[in-house]
UniProtKB/Swiss-Prot annotation:
Residues 135-156 have a biased composition (Basic and acidic residues). Belongs to the SmpB family. Required for rescue of stalled ribosomes mediated by trans-translation. Binds to transfer-messenger RNA (tmRNA), required for stable association of tmRNA with ribosomes. tmRNA and SmpB together mimic tRNA shape, replacing the anticodon stem-loop with SmpB. tmRNA is encoded by the ssrA gene; the 2 termini fold to resemble tRNA(Ala) and it encodes a 'tag peptide', a short internal open reading frame. During trans-translation Ala-aminoacylated tmRNA acts like a tRNA, entering the A-site of stalled ribosomes, displacing the stalled mRNA. Its main location: cytoplasm. It is found in: Cytoplasm. The keyword ATP-binding does not apply. The keyword Ubl conjugation does not apply. This is SsrA-binding protein. GO terms for molecular function: RNA binding. GO terms for biological process: trans-translation. It comes from Shewanella loihica (strain ATCC BAA-1088 / PV-4). Residues 135-163 are annotated as: Disordered. Keywords: Cytoplasm, RNA-binding.
Amino acid sequence: MAKKNAKKSKNPPATIARNKRANFDYKFEEKFEAGLSLMGWEVKSIRVGKVNLSESYVFLRDGEAYLFGCTITPLNTASTHVVCDPMRDRKLLLNRRELDKLQGLVERQGYSIVPISMYWRKNAWVKLEIGLGKGKKEHDKRDDTKEREWKIEKSRTMKHAAR
C-alpha cells in the first residue's frame, strides 16, 4: 500500500523522443545542443510526448539552421484559432560560431546534420541534440552489428564462467 503523503514526481522524464535510426545510419564525430523555436500548441503536445524524430533532418538556409520533417502531432484540445501544422520547419537556436562551423563542414566536407534526441533542460526548455557526421556504408553497419553481438556473447560467457 502506498502512503498518502508519498510524493509523486510531477516532472516528466528528461528525454522526450529519440531518433533510434540515427546511430545505425550515421557515424557522428561531433554533437551539439540546440534550442528550438516553438509555438504554444507544440509545447503542449511535446509535454504529452507526441513527437516523432525518425524522418527528420537539419538543413541550413540563409545562415540559420532549421529542423525539417519532425512531426509534432497537435492535441485535440489545442486552440481552434491557431492553424496547427505538424510538419512545419522549426528554427534551431545556435550560436553564430556553431552555425559557421556546421555550414563549413556541410558544404566543404559532405557532412550531414541529424537530430539524435529531444529532451527537457531544467524542465522548462526543449533542447535538441544534433549530430554532425557522415553516413555509414552497408559494410560498416554489418561490422557494428557483429561487434555488438560479440559484446553480448562475451558478457554472457563471462557471466556463466563466473558461476
